[in-house]
Amino acid sequence: MNRIELKKNNIMDYDIFIFDLDGTLYYQKPFRIKMLCTLIKYVFAHPMSIKDLFIIKEYREVREQWEKYGKEDSSAEKMSLDERQYAYVASQKGVTSERVKHAVELFMLEMPLRVLPPYRDEILGDLIQKLKDKKKTVVIYSDYPVEDKLKCLGIAADACYTSGDADIGCMKPDPKGIRVILNAFNCESNNALMIGDRYEKDGIAAEKNGVDYIIVDCSKKERRKLRDLWS
């Protein structure tokens, strides 16, 4: 079920729309099934790469729980967020940071682009086009790099932010990322709307900034109901 927290009567009364990407602008469940099949085929063709998949598994867990793992890390002043996470995973798996980085780039950034387009959410894609037609500001804010995925999905935004940006440097639900965006556009919190797929990440980050939000359901059937907000 969609979770909607709006103080304004009309969604078009907001000035800035901040969208999450993964699981929001495309349907994540069928995409992950397709990616799993792709990875299995890749491992059969490249058996030595199986260790990299365990590295990726660890990396995803570390990023998901970075609020916990980050406290164990003492390199905050020396490296960027991405570098710290690569180094942490490397220390846990007994490999180099470069190997972690290479595995992330291949399996999480490059390979998904080959299978992603069919899973685009046309409902939110249409909303973004409508917002642009009305000269609204569209921002993408994700914990992962976004530019290549946006291009792959055929979606254009006015600005893109990731948790690894130098002026953010923290993962959702830390409120800093949204605060940076609001400051960049000189926007009051009551004039911004966050749209994501996870309350525990996107919703809480929005709440901590006093920003309204919509948490979209994972099903197409439920997402269709959102059209009533802007039709």
Question: Model features per residue range: what roles?
Answer:
Residues 91, 97-140, 175:
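Short, acidic loop-to-helix structural element flanking the phosphoryl-transfer center
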Residues 32, 117-121, 177-178, 209:
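A generic "structured core" feature
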Residues 1-17, 125-130, 136, 141-231:
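Asp-based, Mg2+/Mn2+-dependent phosphohydrolase catalytic module
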Residues 60-109:
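A metal-dependent, Asp-based hydrolase signature
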